């Protein structure tokens, strides 16, 4: 396809190996260091791009305190080849933060406010816990269900509304680990994982080039034996069918079609459309349905046109209703999360949006797809979606 000057193109993508938050590989690595490592390595392997051209570093991060505080985008960029004359900002849309970072860069490019951006995100959930410093307003319960802030209970509600059984969820959980393990063994993640140093279980420093979160030994029987994690009386959502608490970062280089052509760079993909949408916080996991419908309409497409889909697996009980109402549940094995998802790889909040987008581009490249959708639910009732076309 030919590019228009203000088309938004993805030039490259990379991510860290995903590490367990409890005693995992990144336990002695700070969030800014993970981020700076990715940015530096991506710029190093894209030497046609002068770091001085970077307009802005836009980084997703949810819990912006401690080592993730004081604008971690700037903290990280100062430790890279990007000069001090380039800007940096940290954004949060909870789970969709780094996809929002991508959208922010894309909107700037489309309106002529810059040509080259570095985007991505990070969350070190081992160093900065999910609820650290959070103080919800009690008056919020006058406007939304009190349990809306408990993501697992919103997944229970959504699953119940859509008739999702415990066995369906367990099967989905097993699938995630099996596909992620298969992708690892077959080298499918080599294009996206940027190796970095970490510590093994014995405390030895080594280079990791694989995700330590995947459990290939996961079985249906094993998951069936787990107790409900959020609703002890009659609940169906377990730790085995929920996204893992992990540490990780992801990064993309994004630029205008004109600048890519000027530099002689062959992009991975172009953004066809973007969308966000809101839903009742009590069923926050349903957000990808309206955001994807909106994005497809903006692109003049239908779900039948889409070759591959990456849906963040916050919970199996949430993912299955979304796939059902997007009318791709019967095509899941052909189109959806072919390299597994967050149940196997984890969901470091600020990292995940760019991570699933990059994984989608990899899947499209490896399987010959043209059009892809990356979408995710967002805490407190939102969805965010990006439609990509491979160039």
UniProtKB/Swiss-Prot annotation:
Transmembrane segments: none annotated. Keywords: Acyltransferase, Cytoplasm, Fatty acid metabolism, Lipid degradation, Lipid metabolism, Transferase. NCBIfam families: AcCoA-C-Actrans (TIGR01930), fadA (TIGR02445), PRK08947.1 (NF006510). Catalyzes the final step of fatty acid oxidation in which acetyl-CoA is released and the CoA ester of a fatty acid two carbons shorter is formed. One of its GO terms (biological process) is phenylacetate catabolic process. Gene3D superfamilies: 3.40.47.10. GO terms for molecular function: acetyl-CoA C-acyltransferase activity. The lineage of its organism: Bacteria, Pseudomonadati, Pseudomonadota, Gammaproteobacteria, Pseudomonadales. It is an enzyme of class 2 (transferase). Disulfide bonds: none annotated. It comes from Pseudomonas entomophila (strain L48). One of its GO terms (cellular component) is cytoplasm. The active site is at 95 (acyl-thioester intermediate), 347 (proton acceptor), 377 (proton acceptor). Heterotetramer of two alpha chains (FadB) and two beta chains (FadA). InterPro entries: FadA (IPR012805), Thiolase (IPR002155), Thiolase-like (IPR016039), Thiolase-like_sf_Thiolase (IPR050215), Thiolase_acyl_enz_int_AS (IPR020615), Thiolase_C (IPR020617), Thiolase_CS (IPR020613), Thiolase_N (IPR020616). Belongs to the thiolase-like superfamily. Thiolase family. PROSITE patterns: THIOLASE_1, THIOLASE_2. Coiled coil: none annotated. This is 3-ketoacyl-CoA thiolase. The gene is fadA.
